[in-house]
Amino acid sequence: MYTFQSKVRYSELDPERKLSIASIVDYFQDCSTFHSEQLGVGIDYLEERSLVWVMSYWQIVIDRYPKLCDNITIGTYPYEFRGFMGFRNFFMEDDKGERIIRANSIWSLMDLKAGRPARPTEEMVKAYVPEPKLPMDYEPRKISLEGEGRKMPSFTVGK
């Protein structure tokens, strides 16, 4: 697990003077980058191997938004690797240690030279220590279709 502390800045607020969704995502992405850098499998490691992690999915649950000057702790850890995908939880806590935001994310590792997904290297898998999934309601990723729908004419997709 990796954590860091910060203070909510004016530039991170939305019009209601709460931490904006974009800033929450920035904190979480920075946290995962700091984590990877600390483990020696960060940006330079990936670049040398023509690899990149691509965000595939976010689920963010906000119980309470931090406000201007609130002291916060941001944390992250992976909980699973499957094929070319990495599964990672994030959280944000207030200065009392209460978890006010939780998130689930799925990342895809891409090989930039081959132009396709790649499995994490053995070194990457060893560097990250998976922890138990964060307790939260995990939303399904598939969209359920309701009703019968209607038949449409076929068409060809080209370049």
PLM regions: where:
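Generic short beta-strand
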Residues: 10, 89-92, 107
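Hydrophobic beta-sheet segments that form the core/acyl-binding groove
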Residues: 59-95
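Hot-dog-fold acyl-thioester-processing enzymes
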Residues: 1-55, 102-104, 111-159
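GNAT/GCN5-related N-acetyltransferase fold signature
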Residues: 60, 105-107
